[in-house]
Amino acid sequence: NKNKLIDRGAKMNEFFSLNDTLYSIVEKYPETLGFFVTNGFEQLKNNKMLETMGKTITLEMALKSRKINPELFEEKLITFLQKDEMVDISLNINRGDVKGDVLIEGVLPCPIRIPLLEGIKKWVEEENSKRNYTIAYDLKSANLGLDWVTEKIKTGDPEKVADVLLSAGYELFFDENLMGQYMKNGIFETYIEEMNKDFFIYKIDLRDPKRQYAIVGVVAAVFLINKTTLGNRKAPETWEELLSDEFEDSVALPMNDLDLFNALVVTIYKEYGMEGIHKLAKVYKKSLHPAQMVKAKSRNKDEAPAISIIPYFFTQMLTGASDLYSIWPKDGALLSPIFILSKKEKEDKVKPFLDFFLSENIGTIFSANGKFPSTNPKVENGLEPDQNFKWIGWDFIHNNDIGSLLKNCEKEFIDAIDKL
């Protein structure tokens, strides 16, 4: 996650360059948004300002316009980022080769990673002090991807794969060439019997009938509406309305969030077939994708998208943004599950961790801190009765090769863009 190396004498800056835009710095280090807001850039609280001004103004330009000394500000920001990095070190993150009798690996949602890790570290230390076997963990930030886990899975050797795996999205766990081989042989088996009421209201049963996968929480995606760019068009209230010709070249898709994009693509395919994928390509705002900019038929290449599909978590940042508001689709927010898998043969040794990670305490961190609704029945997710979900369901998952389907849908999506 480190960028350019700049030596200004006092401190080595391996985090950012003064020539980086404010937006690129915040995107790389989300924790810096609060730092900027409290250090002279209050307007960045407004997400629209961050999206527009933040993408065009470099840190150096911004500091000069505020008559702030760039060297002093840079040093202050480096110190802030190094402190955050020290939290990572103290929580035993990025430790290289981790070993234990029980190994827990995977990724955690970025916004709640630190509070989750604090809880996990404390729990693991307590458990290791009283058990005759050791528990170890390596849980990275979701935006770093899963390549390091995938490499072990590709070996086909269950001994090389962690005893507990955590990840959002469908790509890793449902690719027949990856986790599929282990699932068919019954290596992993995890089940949750009781489920939060929020997922039953609309007859959504997140319990796997094959008892192989467990869902600990979900990432819900909703519509973010930009009033100015939307103009006199009526905002879409359902996924079907979003896919209509009226919103051609108007919708920002979560292209930089692979798990969410995969969930979107597979859900649209399940509901509307390949025709739905073609419609998705048509409404996708091409101007956000440099390679397609030339072909884009946008009203204005530089204008913000009228609609963005974003995680529900980000809607809590909308306070004060008069031009932006969110819509929870009437036919349900897109649901991207956060899965947990555990090895059957290690059932006795992994059960304490599963009990802990599926507990009300951890569920509350998912729900309250990150607006990632928890499946724990005791957690109050704070959702209204009409805030339902759209998800593909277990029948569809178990009756399709999801890995191949994702590849086909993605290819169809890109081909459809090329033909526009």
Briefly describe each language-model feature range.
Residues N185-M195, G320-L334, K344:
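Short beta-strand->loop
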